[in-house]
């Protein structure tokens, strides 16, 4: 019982830390709305550097064996290919939102995400909602409607962020690999596409400069 309580408390602290960091992200990304590159190149850069630092952290971690073992498991690779796609879409939408004046929409998306995860847990894994969780889900739906009805349109940015991140969390829960090895595997699966896109974008930029 004490072990369960400790794990719950630790999970809560980790979650609060993650959302505090995410809450500060706009302070870093928003100034880049004046940069001569779009969200697509920002995403590619983020993938490249995430892969580099993730591999570095794994090199000094005891979970290297789990990571290398995963490469020989096609089902695991397939699950992480799906999770990599989901998180790449999530990052792309988020970067576009922050650099195009949709900070509040992005914030709403990540506000609703934990509640959407609760709903997925109920529907997919059969987890039971207590009264507080059910009330939180209802309040989230009311909050979305409260923001959407006055402007006469659906908050697509928030909904897409919620959906992509929720599906990402669902796939990661199904994948039999720890957080750090999973992050390394995801970023390495995305790395070839990101690197190829950066090379393509750089060539396009050089061609435009040569024309000018």
Placement of each model-derived feature along the sequence:
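Hydrophobic/aromatic residues within transmembrane alpha-helices
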Residues: 32, 42, 97-98, 123-125, ...
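Membrane-interface helix termini and inter-helical loops of multi-pass transporters
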Residues: 27-39, 66-68, 99-102, 142-145, ...
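Glycine-/small-residue-enriched transmembrane alpha-helix faces in small-molecule transporters
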Residues: 1-41, 142-174
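Loop-to-transmembrane alpha-helix entry segments
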Residues: 110, 126-146, 151-159, 187
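Membrane-interface interhelical linkers
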Residues: 1-16, 52-82, 131, 183, ...
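C-terminal transmembrane-helix exit sites in multi-pass transporters
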Residues: 96, 113-132
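Structural motif at transmembrane-helix junctions in multi-pass transporters
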Residues: 34-41, 92-109, 178-180
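Specific transmembrane alpha-helical segments of multi-pass solute transporters/efflux pumps
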Residues: 65-104, 146
């Amino acid at each position: 019982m004490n072990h369960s309580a400790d794990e719950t408390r630790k999970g809560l602290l980790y979650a609060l830390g993650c959302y505090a960091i995410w809450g500060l992200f706009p302070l870093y990304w928003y100034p880049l709305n004046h940069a001569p590159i779009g969200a697509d190149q920002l995403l590619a850069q983020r993938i490249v550097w995430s892969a580099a630092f993730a591999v570095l952290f794994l090199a000094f971690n005891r979970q290297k064996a789990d990571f290398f073992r995963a490469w020989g498991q096609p089902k695991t690779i397939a699950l992480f290919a799906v999770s990599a796609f989901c998180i790449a879409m999530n990052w792309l939408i988020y970067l576009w939102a922050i650099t195009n004046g949709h900070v509040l929409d992005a914030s709403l998306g990540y506000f609703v995400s934990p509640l959407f995860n609760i709903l997925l847990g109920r529907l997919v894994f059969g987890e039971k909602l207590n009264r507080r969780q059910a009330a939180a889900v209802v309040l989230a739906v009311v909050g979305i409607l409260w923001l959407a009805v006055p402007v006469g349109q659906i908050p697509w940015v928030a909904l897409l962020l919620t959906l992509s991140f929720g599906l990402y969390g669902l796939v990661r829960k199904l994948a039999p690999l720890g957080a750090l090895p999973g992050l390394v595997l995801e970023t390495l699966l995305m790395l070839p596409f990101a690197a190829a896109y950066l090379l393509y974008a750089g060539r396009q930029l050089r061609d435009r400069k040569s024309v000018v």
